[in-house]
Amino acid sequence: MSPAPDAAPAPASISLFDLSADAPVFQGLSLVSHAPGEALARAPRTSCSGSGERESPERKLLQGPMDISEKLFCSTCDQTFQNHQEQREHYKLDWHRFNLKQRLKDKPLLSALDFEKQSSTGDLSSISGSEDSDSASEEDLQTLDRERATFEKLSRPPGFYPHRVLFQNAQGQFLYAYRCVLGPHQDPPEEAELLLQNLQSRGPRDCVVLMAAAGHFAGAIFQGREVVTHKTFHRYTVRAKRGTAQGLRDARGGPSHSAGANLRRYNEATLYKDVRDLLAGPSWAKALEEAGTILLRAPRSGRSLFFGGKGAPLQRGDPRLWDIPLATRRPTFQELQRVLHKLTTLHVYEEDPREAVRLHSPQTHWKTVREERKKPTEEEIRKICRDEKEALGQNEESPKQGSGSEGEDGFQVELELVELTVGTLDLCESEVLPKRRRRKRNKKEKSRDQEAGAHRTLLQQTQEEEPSTQSSQAVAAPLGPLLDEAKAPGQPELWNALLAACRAGDVGVLKLQLAPSPADPRVLSLLSAPLGSGGFTLLHAAAAAGRGSVVRLLLEAGADPTVQDSRARPPYTVAADKSTRNEFRRFMEKNPDAYDYNKAQVPGPLTPEMEARQATRKREQKAARRQREEQQQRQQEQEEREREEQRRFAALSDREKRALAAERRLAAQLGAPTSPIPDSAIVNTRRCWSCGASLQGLTPFHYLDFSFCSTRCLQDHRRQAGRPSS
């Protein structure tokens, strides 16, 4: 990869106010046209195709006979290109987009020179096609801004600045100056002599800068760089965090009548009056009349401060009026000074800035030109298709011909169908060590899952050892013989017996295998021997299967719990459940110095006292849970009885309720037991007369002899009884 090109050299900046008329940079000045080779300079004509005028001779020469041209060409702008990069850059130009819009509107197209002059002078009204340039209506102002936003984009070719003018002096230096400080607008084509004179006069002598945006106004009168007078206004006209002026908001939809909206409307009117009164004053009016340059920055919705209406301070067709071609901040006096300083700065280059920017552009790539492959013609394509069809036909006939020659040569091809099962358990880590599920399951489900997980884990280790060409029968073969051949040659029977017992949890078979020869070195070596490339031992297999009794027996027989598999996991970490892990902890409590339990990752011993405390804690938790459930059940039953009593009391008539209440009062006065209540369901008669809710612990609402739990029930009862609530 070639190194990145160096950045374009930075120009020297000099203020026009700091130069004298006989400064060296002004000696031998001349107006520079666009450099040859750029897209915008290759059109020495005044119209383009589609404009209804005669085509240029250059285009006729380019067109030639009616054949398919191999040149890169833009038919809209009548331009040719050397490579695709130049063509793509041309399609991004505002000039090309403008000509496309003009062609769609059946309007005359502009050449590169005309378009550059129109855009550099800011005379975009002619570009937009407006005929009435003297109209000062708000609709025309909106059209002007819309066209300006469309055609003044920053997607221009390298070194092309539409608002600047390029000069060259006798020393070979190139000077860039902003067009807006070189005198008023001129009808195209502009006279180079006037531009040179204005440049040598060191910028505008009398200049007025006006800016307005978002309730802010700033204006200043300059003589050179000296400030004659300045004024700023600020009114609250834009709602915070919305960014839209109140007047523009009202124009889009129904006006708001809030206090804030009314305040913003009042401030807009006040700001309009203040600015108009300021610019109509004697000092400002005289300055606007005598100024050689007027610089303006205002949004489309805020231009009514300066244009339109009675006594407008500015006229749209004024040749001294220029839009500020810079990005500006909030209108303040400091911003006015910054804008004037920026516009009156002269940039001096030692070489052509257009060519330098183009060469140093990251879009410029230097490539070796290779001869392109010649594209096949239609006749060649048809011939290729015929050859392919003939070849396919021969291939279809070849089996028939081959059947006859089979007997002669005595050669037969036998095809064998092989079924291959591809396992993907090695890609899933959870198959080796299942995740702990939060949902509680019964012991039968747990035992089945543990057994299946152990079989899947051991089967995965077997599949990792097998080559990819084995059939499904080899995959389904018993695990023992394969492990015997790999790890325990010479004693497969003992190995198979131990492995099968560990899988199934058969403690009796293990005792028979280990009891006759507890000190046999062969058995001791097999207890901690790895199972295949996975490095699983018998202790790993028993722990993964959740066989706690087998784990205890293997540990007592001498199995090493510190042996790790190929993934550096000891048997304790692959245990399927807590009971299996507890066997390691019990063995650690009985044999604290037998192994390095830190390496085995056993957290600590499990003593009988600890197990007793855990059992007691579980019993207490179980009893508390049972008591809590019984209490909740009693509470639910009580609430259900209360709801039933409430429904039955509310269903009684007023006469039955009065009789029941009188009976209760009489029984309370006499101290005698009350008679059974009908249906024996209404236990508490002190209830709301309307809804039947209990009044125990409440302060009831009364009227007459009735009691209610709320005013709503009281009003409902009165309405039902036909009595007014007042």
From Swiss-Prot:
Signal peptide: none annotated. This is tRNA endonuclease ANKZF1. A zinc finger (C2H2-type) spans 72-96. Residues 120-130, 457-473 have a biased composition (Low complexity). The keyword Repeat applies. One of its GO terms (biological process) is rescue of stalled ribosome. It comes from Homo sapiens (Human). Residues 131-141 have a biased composition (Acidic residues). The active site is at 246. The modification Phosphoserine is found at residues 258, 361, 398, 533, 675, 680. Residues 654-666 are annotated as: VCP/p97-interacting motif (VIM). The VLRF1 domain mediates binding to the 60S ribosomal subunit. SUPFAM superfamilies: Ankyrin repeat. Endonuclease that cleaves polypeptidyl-tRNAs downstream of the ribosome-associated quality control (RQC) pathway to release incompletely synthesized polypeptides for degradation. The RQC pathway disassembles aberrantly stalled translation complexes to recycle or degrade the constituent parts. ANKZF1 acts downstream disassembly of stalled ribosomes and specifically cleaves off the terminal 3'-CCA nucleotides universal to all tRNAs from polypeptidyl-tRNAs, releasing (1) ubiquitinated polypeptides from 60S ribosomal subunit for degradation and (2) cleaved tRNAs. Residues 609-659 form a coiled coil.
